[in-house]
Amino acid sequence: MDLLQSLAVFFVLLLPGTEVTGTLKSTLDPSLKIYKKMFEVKRREQLLALKNLAQLNDIHQQYKILDVMLKGLFKVLEDSRTVLIAADVLPDGPLPQDEKLKDAFSHVVENTAFFGDVVLRFPKIVHHYFDHNSNWNLLIRWGISFCNQTGVFDQGPHSPVLSLMAQELGITEKDSDFQNPFTIDRTEFIPSTDPFQKALREEEKRRKKEEKRKEIRKGPRISRSQSEL
């Protein structure tokens, strides 16, 4: 799978894959049960995409894909947060009925969970971006809080992802026995090795140089009329 194909897959995953219907949220709410089943389908798609990304043997390509994907994910999360807050949608309240609100709800739930998957599987790359981005920090804190109140993650196989993500990112204090489950088998995901660290630094230097060149090209220029004076 080349870079463009990989990016296309991840952007599709950022879109809502479940339709929210129903009224009151409770453990007996049939609409919530239906949503959770559809959420499971979306989660399988997300996890498969990350598994394929983890199996790439090109660290630079992984870096590029995650760079674009993370920026897109947080843009979607920020826009969806704005929509839900403007409409006074409460995470523990009735499930949205309006189509726009349904999409925003799904965006928040699915992308917050997806980011948790990325954090746990690619912690070094995510920390490289996340630790210096206060806006992302605020957004994911809100996203985790929202998701914890929806009931979507209750009593399911994906319930641990929110807690593990929060601990990995330092949002909550780590349990004494905390262990990122994906750092045990480092052969399947990005290894913690000197070559990786070196490649990560080289890629970051290259991207910073490219950004500086773009800034220089966009800098102020003397207009033709001024130069003729």
Swiss-Prot record:
One of its GO terms (biological process) is regulation of ossification. Keywords: Coiled coil, Cytoplasm, Endoplasmic reticulum, Glycoprotein, Nucleus, Secreted, Signal. Belongs to the CCDC134 family. One of its GO terms (molecular function) is protein-macromolecule adaptor activity. The gene is Ccdc134. This is Coiled-coil domain-containing protein 134. Pfam families: ERK-JNK_inhib. Transmembrane segments: none annotated. It comes from Rattus norvegicus (Rat). Disulfide bonds: none annotated. One of its GO terms (cellular component) is nucleus. A motif (Prevents secretion from ER) lies at residues 226-229.
